Amino acid sequence: MVAAPFPRGAFIARILRIALRFNTEMRFSNRSPDYVMKEKAIDPRVRIGHVHLKVASLQRALDFYCGVLGFELTQRYGEEAAFVSAGGYHHHIGLNTWESRDAPPPPKGTTGLYHFAILYPTRAALADALRRLMQANVSLAGASDHGVSEALYLSDPDGNGIELYWDRPRELWPRDANWQIEMFTRQLDLENLLSEV
C-alpha cells in the first residue's frame, strides 16, 4: 500500500471555518435552542458513516484495530493518519496523531466521546470478536444484554470507549403495552455467547 500525501493544513482550516460559522450562527440566532425539534425528522436512511479518533501512537492503534479487531487498513498517510474498514468500505474508522502524538488520554470527568459502537451482523460474528479479544488479553469493561442487542464494552489503547454489539431481529425486541421499545441492561452470559464460535 502506498502512503498518499495528506493536505492536513487545508483539511484542518476547512473544519475550523465550518465550526466557527456554526458557532457564530448558534450564538447570534434568534431561534431558541430547541428549534431543531420543531423541524421534520431526519431521513431514516441516514447512517453514521465513520468515526475519526485522535491517538497517541498510530502503529499501536493499527495493531489494535487491525491486529485484534480485524479491520483492514485501507489508506495510510505516513506516521500521521490511517483509515481502516470492514468489507471494502473506504473507511469506518479514521486514526490520526495530528494533535495527539504521545499524548495521554483525556482525564476522567471531562466531556468528549463516551464510546462509539461497532455493529456486527450476527451473534456468531460478535462471539468471534470476543474470542479475538480474549486471545489478545484485552479486558472488557462490561458485557450486557439490552434486549434489543447483546454488547461488549472495552477501551482501545488510547482510552476511547468502544461497544461491540449485534442487534437481535426487530420482531424480537422487547416492547411495552404501547408497543414502545423497552430496553434493559442485564449481565451477558459470555460462555453462552462463545458457544456460537
Task: List where the protein language model places each region.
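Vicinal oxygen chelate
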Residues: 27-42, 47-56, 104-197
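Core segments of cupin and vicinal oxygen chelate
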Residues: 28, 43-45, 53-98
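Short beta-strand/turn micro-motifs at beta-sheet edges
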Residues: 37-40, 101-106
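Acetyl-CoA-dependent GNAT
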Residues: 97-100, 167
